[in-house]
Amino acid sequence: MGTKTHNSRGKIFMIYLILVSLSLLGLILPFKPLFRITSPSSTLRIDLPSPQVNKNPKWLRLIRNYLPEKRIQVGFLNIDEKERESYEARGPLVLKNIHVPLDHIPKNVTWKSLYPEWINEEASTCPEIPLPQPEGSDANVDVIVARVPCDGWSANKGLRDVFRLQVNLAAANLAVQSGLRTVNQAVYVVFIGSCGPMHEIFPCDERVMRVEDYWVYKPYLPRLKQKLLMPVGSCQIAPSFAQFGQEAWRPKHEDNLASKAVTALPRRLRVAYVTVLHSSEAYVCGAIALAQSIRQSGSHKDMILLHDHTITNKSLIGLSAAGWNLRLIDRIRSPFSQKDSYNEWNYSKLRVWQVTDYDKLVFIDADFIILKKLDHLFYYPQLSASGNDKVLFNSGIMVLEPSACMFKDLMEKSFKIESYNGGDQGFLNEIFVWWHRLSKRVNTMKYFDEKNHRRHDLPENVEGLHYLGLKPWVCYRDYDCNWDISERRVFASDSVHEKWWKVYDKMSEQLKGYCGLNKNMEKRIEKWRRIAKNNSLPDRHWEIEVRDPRKTNLLVQ
């Protein structure tokens, strides 16, 4: 009996083991091994599962709620092949992922070649920056995803990089091409990179959001179209009246696009001339003469003058009578300037970006006069200016577009970016590295080096005069007092001096009263006349008999 019981228990245990083994085998068989050894002597080969394509990448999650109710096409720019799968989107929302190739920029195309110091304004050419030309359905996308090059980027200076410019222009080109094909089609551009896009092409007003290194924009296509009309640098004079469809980058055979020409200004804009006075009244006379010269040229555009508390009520009355609409501002100190230096408060000029009740402004320094009507400048985009030296522009006259977010950006960057000259010009050149060249006729600087300007005269086709050195109203009208000071003779010209006084002569007696001489001004003039006489300066201007009536009618201080 005991033996039977023992055998029975053994059978039950064996059956239990078999059932457990079968259960474990059933669990193991459905799983495939992650690797296998192909032969005893071969190298170990590991077959890993294929990476899963990201069906809902971050850029899509960010803009999903902005997309139209249709299947979208996505264009990718500057996305490395190894990264493509992680950025591509799949699913019912996406019709097609299109990777747009970028041709290499020739090695001889550098930033200096795009921004030469001097050009022949009548016959200049620019290097070519190749832009992609998608054809057919590939040229019509709803979203552009572009990785922006950030090599060399720093928060302390501007980034002048031709590859970065190419990617930004390519994104703009593709957006405009797509927007032409469907009326009122919105195109979104997503930039990936810590430095973000070039704000000269994609301004902050068009930014939908920024999340870490993702920058989402909904560009205003008429403005973007005009950007693409501009030369790729200051290597050519920017056109003011241009038609879309005639850009250098557009193939001539695309007649269907060229027929959709629009003027550079898509709608009626509110525009104005603007200048700034701060810290002293030294330029009140200059601002009055500037306003009068604008009116004498035939322009009837609005004129805005920003001023701080240092401008007296008496001067404000004269400025208003000259034609300026007055607005009080608080000064802005240049963060890197020395205390009590001449440029300590020059960043006050940045306040012009706060004049947001206007779409476009032409800023002009108060030591300018206008000789020919300059209203055509309002057709230029931000930032347009005349060249200064090297790759830099002169901020004495510039076309800009007011913007609250741009002003905020300028303020934030003013504490990080140090100006090369301590003033606004050096700072703005680090902000707007991609600018558009105006003719030197618009900003003809009163400067004469002995090598090129021995006669100290200017051509007759000058449209705007920028008075460097001692200003005409602090000299006798009889001659340019820059002649009396050796180191200032590069600014001296009697013929250019006379042009300012022609504007003065057409002013009312009330306005002329703001341009008089006081006793201290006369003493300074006479001091340098004596020094010039003692040094026997060869031009002998110190011998000229002074007949300026202001000399005998000095202002009471």
UniProtKB/Swiss-Prot annotation:
Enzyme Commission identifier(s): 2.4.1.-
Keywords: Cell wall biogenesis/degradation, Glycosyltransferase, Golgi apparatus, Manganese, Membrane, Metal-binding, Signal-anchor, Transferase, Transmembrane, Transmembrane helix
Membrane topology: Single-pass type II membrane protein
Transmembrane parts of this sequence: 11-31
GO CC, alphabetical: Golgi apparatus; Golgi membrane
GO biological process: cell wall organization
Keyword Cell wall biogenesis/degradation: yes
Cofactor names: Mn(2+)
Binding site for Mn(2+): 365, 367, 466
Residues carrying the site annotation Important for catalytic activity: 349
A Pfam family this chain is assigned to: Glyco_transf_8
Annotated compartments: Golgi apparatus membrane
Broad class of enzyme this protein falls into: transferase
Source species, domain of life: Eukaryota
Predominant location: Golgi
Disulfide bonds: none
Residues involved in substrate binding: 365-367, 394-396, 421-425, 466-471
GO terms, molecular function: glucuronosyltransferase activity; metal ion binding
The keyword Glycosyltransferase appears for this protein: yes
Reported function: May be involved in the substitutions of the xylan backbone in stem glucuronoxylan.
Family from the record: Belongs to the glycosyltransferase 8 family. Glycogenin subfamily.
Descriptive protein name: Putative UDP-glucuronate:xylan alpha-glucuronosyltransferase 4
Lineage, uppermost ranks: Eukaryota, Viridiplantae, Streptophyta, Embryophyta, Tracheophyta
Gene: GUX4
